[in-house]
């Protein structure tokens, strides 16, 4: 657990960079600090490992005031990942990852063995271990940075915009890898980002900071989206928060629609015989590979005729995933697959909206029933 108690940081006679901050980052969870430039999120992070000293207040880890701890031991017990990885350019990947274990007195063999475990854990090929940072892509360097931070198995991780310097595709991959690793290791993580979408995706709880280091709201992502505390948080979270909140709503057992499908190589007559403007193509494993527009088929179906714009939702996914699949599909029919990626049916946007309405009606009915019970009334005597 990382706890801030009335923490303030000022520089000279200027206004506070962080102002009377009190919050608690729970053990084993990802707590995200997010806010506009100048809100003090990085300053807050750096006060945990005492790269910056608070002007007043206390920062504690598992109940121990960090100001009372030996500085070297404090920092060696905290994993730290920064924006541009910060790797040592003169050391190979394996030696970069082994840095902290070696500082802690591990033998070279033990430290390197641990480093190789982590290189694989973060999704890197073992043969990259002998390369130098300059020989890696930006995404690979960030993975090495995460591996190095985890090398000594620290209970606490600090991550300062670790994925912001890579392209969107790599960023998505790194985020997914990070969530996988966190699910496996359960570190107490304080994560800084300026991107509210990243905060909502990664955080168990999200702290929204105002300029000047004031805490506006600290809540679960779904709470931020459904119930922002004021106009500042509502504006910062975004006008489409209702749609994004659907990512946290588990999809009910929607009845899926049957859909006629074709395989690659289907003839124009076979495609037209389906009787739809758009026909879904599956591969040999029954996985969806794209839609074919019937009017455009003038030869046996090949991959050049496929429209791949639509996303594929999982049957056990969220309402947002189902709605996105329907809205992004060129046919208007969202593709749904089982956990193994095999096609099982389609869903319309109207199906999802109806499911949302049913969920809300059921919630209102439940709340009304609870209110009636609280006053000791049965349904017949309720006002």
Feature roles, as predicted:
Residues 146:
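Hydrophobic anchor residue at the start of the ABC signature
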Residues 102, 109-127:
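Conserved ABC ATPase "signature" region
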Residues 65-79, 103, 109:
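ABC ATPase NBD coupling module
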Residues 257-285, 308-367, 373-383:
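The conserved cystathionine-beta-synthase
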Residues 34-36:
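The feature captures the beta-strand-to-loop junction immediately N-terminal to the Walker
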Residues 134, 152:
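Conserved signature/switch motifs of ABC ATPase nucleotide-binding domains
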Residues 90-98:
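Short coil-to-helix segment of the ABC ATPase nucleotide-binding domain corresponding to the Q-loop/switch region
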């Amino acid at each position: 657990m990382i706890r801030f108690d009335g923490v303030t940081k000022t520089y000279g006679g200027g206004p506070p960079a962080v102002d009377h901050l009190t919050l608690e980052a729970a053990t084993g969870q990802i707590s995200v600090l997010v806010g506009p430039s100048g809100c003090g999120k990085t300053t807050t992070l750096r006060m945990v490992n005492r790269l910056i000293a608070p002007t007043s207040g206390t920062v504690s880890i598992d109940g121990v005031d960090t100001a009372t701890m030996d500085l070297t031991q404090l920092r060696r017990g905290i994993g730290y990942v920064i924006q541009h990885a910060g790797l040592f350019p003169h050391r190979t990947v394996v030696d970069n990852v082994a840095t902290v274990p070696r500082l802690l007195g591990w033998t070279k063999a033990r430290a390197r063995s641990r480093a190789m475990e982590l290189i694989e854990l973060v999704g890197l090929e073992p043969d990259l271990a002998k390369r130098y940072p300059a020989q890696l892509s930006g995404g690979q360097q960030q993975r090495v940075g995460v591996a190095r931070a985890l090398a000594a198995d620290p209970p606490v991780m600090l991550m300062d915009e670790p994925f912001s310097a890579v392209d969107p595709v790599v960023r998505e991959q790194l985020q997914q890898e990070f969530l996988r690793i966190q699910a496996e290791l359960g570190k107490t993580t304080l994560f800084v980002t300026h991107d509210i979408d990243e905060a909502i995706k990664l955080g168990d709880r999200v702290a929204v900071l105002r300029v000047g280091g004031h805490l506006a709201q600290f809540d679960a992502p779904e709470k931020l989206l459904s119930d922002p505390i004021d106009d500042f948080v509502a504006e910062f979270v975004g006008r489409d928060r209702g749609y994004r909140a659907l990512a946290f709503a588990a999809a009910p057992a929607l009845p899926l629609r049957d859909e006629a499908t074709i395989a690659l190589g289907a003839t124009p007559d076979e495609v037209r015989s389906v009787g739809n403007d758009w026909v879904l193509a599956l591969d040999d494993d029954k996985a969806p590979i794209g839609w074919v527009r019937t009017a455009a088929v003038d030869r046996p179906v090949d991959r050049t005729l496929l429209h791949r714009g639509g996303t594929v939702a999982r049957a056990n996914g969220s309402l947002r995933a189902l709605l996105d699949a329907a809205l992004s599909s060129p046919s208007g029919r969202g593709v749904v697959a089982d956990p193994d990626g095999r096609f099982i049916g389609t869903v319309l946007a109207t199906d999802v909206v109806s499911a949302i309405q049913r969920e809300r009606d059921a919630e209102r009915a439940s709340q009304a029933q609870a209110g009636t019970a609280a006053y000791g009334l049965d349904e017949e005597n309720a006002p």
